[in-house]
């Protein structure tokens, strides 16, 4: 494709047809109907970037890195969005000691009732449901006055709901990504600072057993000084396009059609960023370059699986099947970030972290280094039998404490339960969250930055500093006991 053709194609995607997102709803894990016809923000290829400077902190606002809220004996939790993802959180939150589910909001009454049924079965108490439109969560906030809200609507609603619940007095815990634009991320950061409420993007992968163990190994210096990381979200999800009226595919498909970059970066990036202490005293995000492959798979899938006049076959899919980005940190370290939700290939998040003394990698779990095994770093230590001594020595204390129960509870191998458990534990003990609002903003900002870079032929994009320089004062995430 020549440059002029590529440019025309890009410019054609700048607008989203009115009502294109109207199929969205609170119904799915990350799903809500829009307030009004709303456009997905697509960067102008002639613009130098989304934001290369940052606004000053507002009067009365405080830096939230390491913030400790007053202890809560019992945490009253409400939910906005209880579809596939939100309902999973409901089932697990209902059994966590010290948490009480006090309200459930969703556009679909049947799905709200389904989650209320789960809570009643597990606890004997039935929470009220709120299903009178997309802003009924505000009525819920006024009536039940929750301490914390789990925010699981569609991406277009993350910013609005998250900011509203903080302004109405609750800590906010929002599904990934935190928001879809740099502007929205700044709004969330500012609201958290002004209200002095926690806002944590719920990156569950940081609580996986492998990820926790690698964090423990990195903190103990097993692989020396960190140099390089590889992160990814490789997950074939074309089948979601069959969710035409309700479900993730009913709204997410439009993102594949109208954007071109890494639209879902945080699952792979979150753990790598915390291994490296990015935005925590040692180092920070610097700049990013990004490239996308041709966009072929979604159109081919639509043609094969839907009638010729189906709405999916009327879309001109812009998002490359594979996006590859490289992040350069302020210390000069590099991170590869890949994204592909279209190609027929096995699932992977890569999860590779390389240091001066060795390398830890995922998919499959394998390690090599001067301090590992017999020191033969020319071969991986992999497989259940060979890795057993590694897990025995370096398993994270948090996983040792919670892991067995988490495995019984399920949720992506237990990581979901560990995450929710830690949220409640931190709120009850008045501890800082394991992931602060700035980390969620940095990790999520890769999406729009990658779109700008792709649109400009791979030109570098500077990360906004959501901490306004205060990352240098933020302690690295320790090894939680």
Curated annotation (Swiss-Prot):
Signal peptide span per the entry?
1-29
Enzyme class, UniProt record, top EC level: hydrolase
**What processing steps or modifications follow its translation?**
Predicted to be exported by the Tat system. The position of the signal peptide cleavage has not been experimentally proven.
Please give the Pfam families that the UniProt record associates with this protein: GFO_IDH_MocA, Glyco_hydro_109_C
Q: Does the keyword Hydrolase apply?
A: yes
Which residues are recorded as binding substrate? Answer: 233, 252, 264-267, 347
Q: Which InterPro entries match?
A: Gfo/Idh/MocA-like_OxRdtase_N, Gfo/Idh/MocA_oxidrdct_glycsds, Glyco_hydro_109_C, NAD(P)-bd_dom_sf, TAT_signal, TAT_signal_bac_arc
The UniProt annotation places NAD(+) binding at: 84-85, 106, 155-158, 175-176, 204, 264
Alphabetically ordered keywords of this record:
Glycosidase, Hydrolase, NAD, Signal
Co-factor(s): NAD(+)
Which one of the record's GO molecular function terms can you name? nucleotide binding
Cofactor: how bound:
Binds 1 NAD(+) per subunit. The NAD(+) cannot dissociate.
Q: What EC number is given for this enzyme?
A: 3.2.1.-
Q: What does this protein do?
A: Glycosidase.
Record-stated family:
Belongs to the Gfo/Idh/MocA family. Glycosyl hydrolase 109 subfamily.
- What NCBIfam families does UniProt report for this protein, alphabetically? TAT_signal_seq (TIGR01409)
Q: What is this protein called?
A: Glycosyl hydrolase family 109 protein 1
**Which taxonomic lineage does the organism of this UniProt entry have?**
Bacteria, Pseudomonadati, Verrucomicrobiota, Verrucomicrobiia, Verrucomicrobiales
């Amino acid at each position: 494709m020549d440059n002029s053709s590529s440019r025309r194609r890009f410019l054609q995607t700048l607008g989203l047809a009115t009502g294109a997102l109207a199929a969205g709803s609170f119904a799915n894990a990350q799903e809500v109907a829009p307030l009004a016809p709303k456009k997905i923000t697509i960067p102008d290829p002639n613009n130098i970037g989304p934001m290369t400077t940052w606004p000053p902190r507002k009067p009365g606002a405080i830096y939230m890195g390491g913030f400790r809220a007053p202890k809560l004996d019992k945490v009253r939790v409400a939910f906005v969005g209880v579809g596939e993802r939100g309902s999973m959180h409901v089932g697990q939150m209902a059994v966590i000691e010290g948490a009480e589910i006090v309200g459930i909001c969703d556009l679909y009454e049947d799905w709200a009732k389904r989650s209320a049924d789960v809570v009643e079965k597990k606890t004997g108490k039935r929470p009220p449901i709120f299903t009178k439109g997309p802003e009924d969560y505000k009525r819920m906030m006024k009536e039940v006055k929750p301490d914390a809200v789990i925010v699981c609507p569609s991406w277009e609603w993350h910013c609005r709901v998250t900011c509203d619940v903080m302004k109405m007095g609750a800590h906010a815990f929002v599904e990934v990504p935190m928001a879809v634009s740099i502007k929205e991320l700044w709004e969330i950061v500012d609201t958290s600072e002004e209200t002095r409420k926690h806002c944590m993007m719920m990156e569950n992968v940081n609580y996986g057993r492998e990820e926790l163990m690698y964090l423990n190994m990195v903190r103990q210096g097993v692989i020396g000084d960190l140099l390089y990381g590889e992160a990814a979200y490789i997950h074939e999800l074309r089948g979601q396009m069959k969710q035409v009226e309700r479900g993730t595919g009913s709204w997410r498909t439009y993102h594949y059609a109208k954007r071109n970059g890494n639209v879902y970066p945080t699952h792979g990036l979150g753990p790598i960023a915390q291994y490296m202490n990015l935005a925590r005293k040692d180092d920070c995000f610097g700049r990013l370059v990004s490239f996308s492959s041709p966009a072929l798979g979604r159109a081919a899938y639509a043609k094969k699986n839907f009638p010729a006049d189906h709405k999916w076959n009327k879309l001109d899919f812009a998002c490359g099947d594979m996006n590859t980005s490289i992040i350069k940190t302020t210390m000069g370290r590099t991170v590869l970030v890949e994204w592909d939700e279209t190609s027929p290939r096995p699932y992977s998040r890569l999860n590779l972290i390389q240091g001066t003394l060795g390398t830890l990698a995922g998919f499959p779990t394998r390690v090599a280094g001067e301090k590992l095994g017999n020191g033969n770093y020319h071969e991986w230590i992999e497989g259940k039998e060979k890795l057993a001594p590694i897990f025995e020595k370096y398993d994270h204390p948090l996983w040792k404490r919670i892991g067995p129960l988490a495995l019984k509870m399920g949720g992506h191998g237990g990581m979901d339960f560990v995450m929710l458990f830690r949220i409640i534990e931190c709120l009850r003990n008045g501890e800082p969250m394991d992931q602060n609002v700035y980390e969620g903003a940095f990790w999520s900002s890769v999406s729009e930055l990658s779109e700008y870079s792709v649109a400009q032929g791979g030109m570098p994009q500077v990360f906004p500093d959501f901490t306004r320089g205060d990352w240098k004062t933020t302690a690295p995430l320790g090894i939680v006991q």
